[in-house]
Design a protein with these regions (language model features):
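Hydrophobic, membrane-interfacing alpha helices
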Residues: 1-180
Length: 181
């Protein structure tokens, strides 16, 4: 059994912290963007171009996606996990540095961003989601590693040798389900 003791803060300058979770977002977005550009460039030369979006258009799309991830992820957390608190403390919603994002809110934000972008640029929603589905696992991978580092989203109690004791969940070992995904 392993006892989870990872610090979610990578760098602490006292007045400013850099957390593993923010690094996961940054890496996921940058590596996803680079991989998408590689896919787009390779299919531009192919007569079976399934992507039908240029690298310049994808660069513009990234701005929409980042906004969708951040706003959707935060609002998802606020609505699904702590609506009562945030309805009483409305100004706390914008304090992203205090934590609180949700995958399903981020996903909804991304879908809305793609809908807006596709209508504005007159590009098929499904052509955009084709490329997004290829690169999204990169971001999800880094996000789940950050969930493990944060000691959140742990699995059921387990007696397996690779189970992890997450102190925030009590003394019972649990599946490290974050890294299974």
């Amino acid at each position: 059994m392993i006892v989870h003791s990872l610090d979610p803060v990578l760098i602490d300058l006292g007045f400013f912290q850099i957390r593993w979770y923010s690094i996961a977002y940054i890496l996921g977005i940058i590596l996803g963007w680079l991989y998408a550009n590689k896919i787009i460039k390779s299919t531009e030369e192919n007569k079976y171009n399934f992507v039908q979006i240029s690298t310049q258009q994808f660069d513009s799309l990234i701005v929409y996606l980042v906004i969708g991830i951040i706003i959707g992820g935060r609002l998802g957390y606020v609505i699904f996990y702590n609506l009562e608190y945030y309805s009483q403390n409305f100004s706390e919603i914008i304090k992203l540095w205090q934590g609180g994002m949700s995958f399903h809110g981020g996903l909804l934000g991304v879908v809305i961003s793609i809908i807006i972008f596709s209508k504005k640029r007159k590009i098929s929603f499904f052509k955009i989601t084709d490329i997004i589905s290829c690169v999204a696992p990169i971001g999800i991978f880094f996000g789940r590693i950050a969930n493990f580092i944060n000691g959140e989203l742990y699995g059921k109690i387990s007696s397996l040798s690779w189970s992890v004791i997450f102190p925030s969940a009590g003394n019972s070992p649990r599946h490290p389900s974050q890294i299974y995904e």
